[in-house]
């Protein structure tokens, strides 16, 4: 199971995965292409459900002038989140997910917004800088 929600008030994207969802997410990263659909999550009034996650490999030039290798773009109009990563970012995400897969079944991924403005950013697009993994109790994923 995978749930992904976006909170405009606190500016964060939260991904909740159980083991099956984690394996789907890892397989998506390994393929370096494609989309992963998310079911509508239980939301409060300040949460927006995000329907799909698309992982897009990009060249290192996309991140020139920055000190990171993973970007996450949220499109308000299409309710889509896109992860962009170069080779180093791809390795970082694989390492994190492999570590979590070995140590626990349930977790959520919290992506913190950055003020970095990319060339692709519009009024409907937000840029997220970093992805951090936190353990999550089993009751979170049903």
Name the predicted role of every residue range:
Residues 1-142:
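Positively charged, low-complexity terminal tracts
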């Amino acid at each position: 199971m995978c749930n992904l929600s976006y909170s405009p008030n606190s500016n964060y994207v939260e991904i909740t995965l159980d083991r099956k969802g984690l394996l789907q997410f890892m397989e998506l990263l390994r393929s370096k292409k494609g989309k992963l659909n998310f079911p509508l999550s239980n939301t409060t009034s300040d949460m927006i459900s995000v329907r799909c996650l698309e992982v897009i490999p990009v060249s290192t030039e996309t991140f020139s002038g920055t000190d990171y290798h993973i970007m996450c773009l949220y499109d308000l109009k299409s309710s889509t989140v896109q992860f962009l990563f170069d080779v180093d970012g791809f390795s970082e995400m694989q390492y994190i997910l492999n570590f979590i897969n070995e140590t626990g079944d349930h977790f959520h991924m919290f992506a913190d917004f950055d003020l970095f403005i990319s060339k692709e950013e519009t009024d409907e697009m937000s840029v997220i800088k970093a992805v951090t993994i936190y353990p999550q109790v089993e009751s979170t994923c049903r």
